[in-house]
Amino acid sequence: MVDFSTSVLAVRGCRIRLMRGGAGSPLVVLHGASGATVLPVMQQLAEKFDVIAPEHPGFGESDTPDWLDNIHDLAYFYLDVLDELKLKDVNLVGLSFGGWIATELAVRNTQRLASLTLCGAAGLYLAGVEQLDPFLRGDEQRLRDFFYDQIISFRNSDDRENFSPTAH
């Protein structure tokens, strides 16, 4: 099992928590709305890659900067993170909400990426479909937006006692 270290990285005046483990080509994992953690699959990937898992601004122990207003701000921020870490030919993995960020990053600078992998990506723009901004919604509304099946959203809620699923 590969050990992951935790450090703090400051970029554009914003301090974010960064987990890193393994060796090899860089593989950046952008977490979903539930937060950053070292997942079992990341342990396996760290056997072949230098796995880098930043915690998004506004999540967990990372700062919430005044300039953070939308998903586009996060995409540009992560391009600056890649610069700060001096990463090239990055394998970028986006999980759920992180998939949205990864997609926005990729359309802004494909030259930095060796690959793009999206897992259950949220927030992708489709013509005729309302685009939701999770920064403008409360925790319960975000869960309702992200999960069609309310039982799944209930299982993922940290506040189960106050959560009331609705039928679709």
Task: Outline where the language-model segments fall.
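Flexible "cap/lid" loop of the alpha/beta hydrolase fold
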Residues: 100-108, 113-146
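Conserved HGGG/HGGXW glycine-rich cap/lid loop of the alpha/beta-hydrolase fold
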Residues: 10-63
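Conserved alpha/beta-hydrolase "nucleophile elbow" surrounding the catalytic nucleophile
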Residues: 31, 90, 94-99
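A domain-start/cap signature at the N-terminus of enzymes
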Residues: 1-9
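Alpha/beta-hydrolase
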Residues: 145-168
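Active-site loop/oxyanion-hole signature of alpha/beta-hydrolase fold enzymes
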Residues: 52-94
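Conserved catalytic-core motifs of eukaryotic protein kinase domains, centered on the activation segment
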Residues: 39-40, 62-68, 127-130
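Structural signature of beta-strand start/N-cap positions in the alpha/beta core
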Residues: 26, 50, 88-91, 112-115
